[in-house]
Structure formats: C-alpha cells, structure tokens
C-alpha cells in the first residue's frame, strides 16, 4: 500500500472510504476529540464538517493507506485504510478515559502521540493494512517530534472479534510493531507505548 497524510488533497479519498456513515455511526473520527455532549450533538454532518476543517488546516490528524503504490492523483486514488494519530493533547477525551490514564499522574505528556482509531475497508480486512498503517504512524509521529507513541488496543486473546470491537487495533498488532505493554486496563484493553528515536 501507499501511505499518505490526511490533508485537503486526500480528503476526498477519506470521504469515499468512510462513506455516508462517517466510518461508523456518523463518528467521522471525532469521538476522542470531543466531550460526550459535543459528540452526540455533532453525529453526522456536523462531525464531518469539523473533521474536514481539521484536515484542511494541515494539523497532524492521521494517515490513509491507498491500494496502489503508483503516483495516482490522491483525489482519484481509492483509500483502503485509515489510522488516527495526533499529539495526545489533541484528544480531550483521553484526559478522562480510564484506558488512557498515565501510570504516573505527574508525567509530562509533551511529546506523547496517541493512536486512537483504525478503519479498514471491508474488502481489505485481514491483509495487514492496519499493521502497515501503524508502522507508518510511528515513523510519521517521530518525524514530527514525538518521543513516544501510545495506543489503547483490544486484547483479543486469539479470539475473533467483529470490526466494531477492533477499531482501537489489537494488542498483538501493537506488540508485533515494537510497542510495550505498559498496563492492562480491564480484561480486554491495554495501554501500550513505543519510544521513538
């Protein structure tokens, strides 16, 4: 696959990948950026508009995987996967989320980036697209000054799960990508981290 940053030029490909439902239930990858009240009032077109505005600012918000490694115009190429990744402070929900709670409450989180979400087109699932996106995300964050990348994956313990259970990624995928298990968060979730050069 070819990986590209989400920006104004690749926005049309993201819209086609997410479809009219905004990936899942009108989320448009805004869940981690909003309070519950903001999210509920924005489901659908409002979330889409807000996410589109973010993409057009050039702020780091994530990467797309395309089904070709050619130099096809990004407005015509078909995206097959997405990973949301940004500085941890950009995700207001993480301040309150048990799964993302730092081990040390006094830790300086400057330079920590968070991988919050994956979305892979149903026709591309099972082909390693999410793992390729995760590898690219670590490099991309490092190039932008991250010192640590963290995630909040699901521990499937070898069991099959539905795609709606896996949007955080799997623990195995993160560990295979060089992340360390920092802490278990309940029976199915984990906090993982990888220090980047």
Mark where each language-model region is:
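Conserved acyl-donor/pantetheine-binding loop and adjacent beta-alpha core of acyl/acetyltransferases
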Residues: 53-57, 76-121, 125, 161-168, ...
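Conserved acetyl-CoA-binding loop-helix of GNAT-fold acetyltransferases
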Residues: 115-120, 126-143
